[in-house]
Amino acid sequence: MMYPFMTLNDNTEIVHSEMKADGTVKVYIETPDVEYCFKHATCWLPDYKWEDIKGYSNLELAYFKQLIRNNAHLIIEFSKQRRRFR
């Protein structure tokens, strides 16, 4: 299950999974787009491994990478709480 973390002014949604047994957390970013329908990217914490990137420019991706790095501690903490309460 994915849980909301943040919605940006351009309707980009950032959601995260609960923490997996191996300590990883999936962070998914999705932005509505005319050309692609949705641009999207996935980041796995705590390794910051990015995959399944579609439609984002290098500049947009750099912004999201910094945003996730700046908020990873919160996402990880929230994902631990989700795991405890399921």
Provide a role label for each language-model segment.
Residues 55-86:
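Acidic, low-complexity intrinsically disordered segments
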